[in-house]
Amino acid sequence: MRSPYLIGVFLAAGKSRRMGQNKLALPLKGENIGSLSLKTALSSRLDHVLVVERTEHASLEWIGAPYHAPPFQKRWSLHVCQDAEKGQGHSVSSGVRKAESMGADGIVILLADQPQLSVDHLNALVALAPESFAVSSFLGAFTPPIYFSSTCFPYVKGLKGDEGARRLLKSGQLGAGAVLEAKDSGELDDIDTPEEYDMVRRAMS
């Protein structure tokens, strides 16, 4: 029996409005926010990572040379979402459609602005791999990364606008899933504002 083929859908198509500049390119721990988040995904047990961007050029601002060379080069590919401007739901559904066309048995929704996420947490989520979904949580608050099996794809592909995957979990449409509690809140924090960026820089210094 073969192992499930799992693809990470790495959401990097946001416009960073609250930051005022491309937050993924902001320096952090010798790299930048986006590359540190991507490194975690590429170092995990995921078989492949789809980087979902709004344009091909946008990815060049933060994906550095190390990710275009071994050992990372063949572990990821770029997927441009033509409707990214319409909201995150479109990026999610577009990424899942692409992953499905690549033969994915399951996908993990990942955020490009979660640089404190650990490989251990991501691997633990993948190891759960239930028949429906597995979601990360801290003190009861659900957040990416979120695993979805192929049985959930029809629902996830229906997301649009600013709808997030969490709405599906709360709707009950997907049945019972698994919850993986993070060891600390910082691991699941995303970065949207200059204040949050400063906090993460201090935490990771």
UniProtKB/Swiss-Prot annotation:
Q: Which InterPro entries match?
A: MobA-like_NTP_Trfase, Nucleotide-diphossugar_trans, Xanthine_dehydrogenase_PucB
* Cited CDD domains: GT_2_like_f
**Keywords on this record?**
Purine metabolism
Instruction: Name the source's superkingdom.
Output: Bacteria
Give the record's GO biological process terms: hypoxanthine catabolic process
Q: In which pathway does it act?
A: Purine metabolism; hypoxanthine degradation
Q: Does the keyword Amino-acid biosynthesis apply?
A: no
Concerning what turns on (or off) its expression, the entry says:
Expression is very low in excess nitrogen (glutamate plus ammonia) and is induced during limiting-nitrogen conditions (glutamate). Expression decreases when allantoin is added during limiting-nitrogen conditions.
Molecular function GO labels: nucleotidyltransferase activity
Q: Which NCBIfam families match?
A: pucB
Q: What does this protein do?
A: Required for xanthine dehydrogenase activity. Could be involved in formation of the molybdenum cofactor required by xanthine dehydrogenase.
Protein name as annotated:
Purine catabolism protein PucB
Q: Which source organism does the UniProt entry give?
A: Bacillus subtilis (strain 168)
Its lineage opens with: Bacteria, Bacillati, Bacillota, Bacilli, Bacillales
